[in-house]
């Protein structure tokens, strides 16, 4: 009996450290469950974020469409009523809110933008003149930015295609270009300094061409030279500062919204608003 007892109590003792290293089966289940639950939460959170981004993008496109629809029947601002201007302003502010405060990307800004609407008096007056004068037409109006490789400024060209139908081709008989350099003064404000006004790309109509060089007669060297001179004619008028040391004529321009296909701007000081859409590159 003593031997049995001795044999029993002489068995090796179980180490406490070994016991502690053994994880209960139930605890492993809970740990794995927590891991799976965390993964599910992360996936669900990612899917929710993606849906929010998509919803925001769709909402933005709808708001941009609403803005373009609001300006559609205003003849680029010429015939806009006070009620229409209020609706347009509200739509403008809504779109501006989608990327308000973001830095302007010069790569996106670079290129040609076609005017869809403006309330700027110095542009609307051109449309008014064209509506009243039968011998004067205003075609497309563009802003052309050259700033891809710069972060502090660049060149901006305001381009107006116009015509005298009795002498020039319809809508695109000639091009008026107002060139300015601009400096970036804040994340969205740029200061324009106008440098030059030019008239170029003169395209006379067929009737005038026939008068200068009739098709039924051999075209003389003089008539051909005259046609070539008209086509390549370019008149330039510099816009200089009124006195040494002062800036040339200019103004502050606030770029209130920019993406790949829409540009919104405001001329600071009550000079009007502008709605542009991206256009094909314009060669000048």
Swiss-Prot record:
Its main location: plastid. Signal peptide: none annotated. InterPro entries: PAP (IPR039633), PAP/fibrillin_dom (IPR006843). Residues 1-40 form a transit peptide. Keywords: Chloroplast, Plastid, Transit peptide. It comes from the Eukaryota. It is found in: Plastid, Chloroplast, Plastoglobule. The keyword Chloroplast applies. It holds the Pfam family PAP_fibrillin. One of its GO terms (cellular component) is plastoglobule. Belongs to the PAP/fibrillin family. This is Probable plastid-lipid-associated protein 10, chloroplastic. The gene is PAP10.
């Amino acid at each position: 009996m003593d031997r049995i007892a001795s044999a029993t109590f002489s068995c090796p003792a179980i180490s406490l450290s070994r016991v502690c290293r053994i994880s209960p089966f139930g605890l492993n289940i809970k740990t794995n469950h927590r891991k799976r639950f965390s993964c599910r939460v992360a996936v669900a959170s990612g899917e929710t974020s993606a849906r929010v981004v998509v919803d925001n993008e769709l909402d933005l496109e709808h708001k941009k469409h609403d803005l373009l629809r609001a300006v559609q029947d205003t003849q680029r601002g010429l015939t806009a009523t006070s009620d229409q201007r209020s609706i347009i302003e509200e739509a403008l502010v809504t779109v501006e809110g989608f990327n308000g405060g973001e830095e302007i990307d010069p790569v996106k800004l670079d290129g040609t933008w076609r005017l869809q609407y403006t309330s700027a008096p110095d542009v609307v007056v051109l449309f008014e003149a064209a509506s009243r004068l039968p011998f004067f037409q205003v075609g497309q109006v563009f802003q052309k930015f050259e700033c891809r490789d710069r972060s502090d400024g660049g060149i901006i060209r305001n381009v107006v295609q116009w015509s005298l139908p009795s002498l020039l081709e319809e809508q695109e008989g000639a091009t008026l270009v107002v060139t300015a350099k601009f400096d970036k003064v804040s994340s969205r404000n740029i200061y324009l300094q106008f440098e030059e006004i030019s008239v170029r790309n003169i395209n006379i109509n067929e009737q005038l061409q026939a008068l200068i060089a009739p098709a039924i007669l051999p075209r003389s060297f003089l008539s051909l030279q005259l046609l070539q001179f008209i086509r390549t004619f370019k008149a330039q008028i510099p816009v200089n500062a009124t006195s040494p040391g002062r800036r040339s004529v200019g103004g502050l321009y606030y770029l209130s919204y920019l993406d790949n296909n829409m540009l919104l701007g405001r001329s600071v000081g009550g000079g009007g608003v502008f709605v542009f859409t991206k256009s094909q590159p314009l060669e000048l």
